[in-house]
Amino acid sequence: MSNLRKFKDEERESEYGRVYAVSGPVVTAEAMSGSAMYELVRVGYYELVGEIIRLEGDMATIQVYEETSGVTVGDPVLRTGKPLSVELGPGIMGSIFDGIQRPLRDIGVMTNSIYIPKGVNTTALSRSEMWEFNPLNVRVGSHITGGDLYGVVHENTLVKQRMIVAPRAKGTVRYIAPAGNYNLEDIVLETEFDGEITKHTMLQVWPVRQPRPVTEKLPANHPLFTGQRVLDSLFPCVQGGTTAIPGAFGCGKTVISQALSKYSNSDVIIYVGCGERGNEMSEVLRDFPELTCEIDGVTESIMKRTALVANTSNMPVAAREASIYTGITLSEYFRDMGYNVAMMADSTSRWAEALREISGRLAEMPADSGYPAYLGARLATFYERAGRVKCLGNPEREGSVSIVGAVSPPGGDFSDPVTSATLGIVQVFWGLDKKLAQRKHFPSINWLISYSKYMRALDEYYDKNYPEFVPLRTKVKEILQEEEDLSEIVQLVGKASLAETDKVTLEVAKLLKDDFLQQNSYSPYDRVCPFYKTVGMLRNIMAFYETARHAVESTAQSDNKITWNTIRESMGGIMYQLSSMKFKDPVKDGEQKIKADYDQLYEDLQQAFRNLED
């Protein structure tokens, strides 16, 4: 009996395994019995960060999130006993992390180098920085559970971090810190449950692969305004929605996702650069601090509401996979405070390629185009973490996470496995067109193939705030579709042989394409287009279409019939005004003046047609 192994002897068991084989970012280790799936390990003498992705006997397969050159067989592998997690707390906004939440700015200061050294071990959030903590109405003796708010930290002038009790914690409050300055290691809350005392700091740690719990998911009902006319009017997304932007190289995916992060009506932006060019991330870092948005009459830098997860194409492949999960976990943390968060993933194709590379190293059975068979499932687990929710705990609050994923299919081919898997999951599809981009028509959204499944959900919002908008949108889509059908005839027989009403349709479609759907992201007047301006422009163009068509149809049988040429000659001024509606600057001119100008143009337009018909 005496030589039987007892449980207490297990503690003597070594926490070290040994490296058995190395293949690129995939390391196999032996003597790893007792370790768990997705456990975080430190590989080799440099202590490289890795994660267990397969267990077989006492062998573990580890994907390493750093460069593995120099790791040899027999090197130690240290088990940490916890999953890959991110730190959540004050200090996230305005910072830039890599795929596994290492703070790039701090590492740069610490090492004085432009490269990240191997096995660097820094905390994601600064432990020494002091934050001003203000307790909410939580007193000693009150009962709290996971998700309850117990304090507020003003992280900066744009974002107030509401301190949340960790989702699994509960108990009676024994101590709550008075208002004052604390760092992330100071205890601000103590709870007791079943005689067990738990101490809480302002810092929470959460595993990235696990969604944060919520009370219930709610249907989305408020639009995510992007400031891009073509998207807001024809293919709207909702707060808490999922969107894909597939497009070939040079079509302007990054410009659209940057415009979204600059001008959308979200409270917090998480921008994940996943395997894209390094200079795109540096462009974001250069532009965002200079960009401002106005909140309650005060101009603030946009960087204050943004966190960047940068994982450029020359960083280790495995970390690309983690970067998407890091980004979505940060987003869920702010959602739980009751904010509307927008997460940009640029681009999910690179993430899928990282999956493909790791899967190839593991010798798994490849499916379509060499991607692993679980590609669709992985994409779904990521996109399904979006949504509008009722948050855990008290007071009652609602938050949302909207995901906008850019997809770059090779050669702009939308039948690529990543694109087709993504389109099966997301609700909004903004398809970018190479031909439009070559014609310098930006944003190069192809209005014939794009779609949004949120139209029905948003009808109530539009009816309440912009009652004339829905019929206008339907009419625009009809005109653009009609123009597509007519263009084939025009190529065969020329414009002159068309019916007069068709000529009107063609000209109005041209007006729509050149002066409504096109938008210059680099001009002060047009880089963002508020929704009232979009609706005003639509109303006037459609009024012109209806009246012109009516004038042509009603006089077709009479002697002095009005043709399109007559209209064009007598309406030069009106048509010029219609095409220059976009030059009204929402910042300089203001909402009142723009609306008044558009109403005046509407009156002039009706009057001009009355004069013409008389």
UniProtKB/Swiss-Prot annotation:
Keywords: ATP-binding, Hydrogen ion transport, Ion transport, Nucleotide-binding, Translocase, Transport. One of its GO terms (cellular component) is vacuolar proton-transporting V-type ATPase, V1 domain. The keyword Flavoprotein does not apply. It catalyses: ATP + H2O + 4 H(+)(in) = ADP + phosphate + 5 H(+)(out). Its EC number is 7.1.2.2. Transmembrane segments: none annotated. GO terms for molecular function: ATP binding; ATP hydrolysis activity; proton-transporting ATPase activity, rotational mechanism. GO terms for biological process: ATP metabolic process; cellular response to hypoxia; proton transmembrane transport; vacuolar acidification. ATP binds at residues 247-254. It comes from the Eukaryota. ATP hydrolysis occurs at the interface between the nucleotide-binding domains of subunits A and B. ATP hydrolysis triggers a conformational change in the subunits D and F, which induces a shift of subunit d. The c-ring is subsequently rotated and results in a continuous proton translocation across the membrane. It is an enzyme of class 7 (translocase). PROSITE patterns: ATPASE_ALPHA_BETA. PANTHER family: H(+)-TRANSPORTING TWO-SECTOR ATPASE (PTHR43607:SF1), V-TYPE PROTON ATPASE CATALYTIC SUBUNIT A (PTHR43607). Catalytic subunit of the V1 complex of vacuolar(H+)-ATPase (V-ATPase), a multisubunit enzyme composed of a peripheral complex (V1) that hydrolyzes ATP and a membrane integral complex (V0) that translocates protons. V-ATPase is responsible for acidifying and maintaining the pH of intracellular compartments and in some cell types, is targeted to the plasma membrane, where it is responsible for acidifying the extracellular environment. NCBIfam families: PRK04192.1, V-ATPase_V1_A. Belongs to the ATPase alpha/beta chains family. V-ATPase is a heteromultimeric enzyme made up of two complexes: the ATP-hydrolytic V1 complex and the proton translocation V0 complex. The V1 complex consists of three catalytic AB heterodimers that form a heterohexamer, three peripheral stalks each consisting of EG heterodimers, one central rotor including subunits D and F, and the regulatory subunits C and H. The proton translocation complex V0 consists of the proton transport subunit a, a ring of proteolipid subunits c9c'', rotary subunit d, subunits e and f, and the accessory subunits VhaAC45 and ATP6AP2. This is V-type proton ATPase catalytic subunit A isoform 1. The gene is Vha68-1.
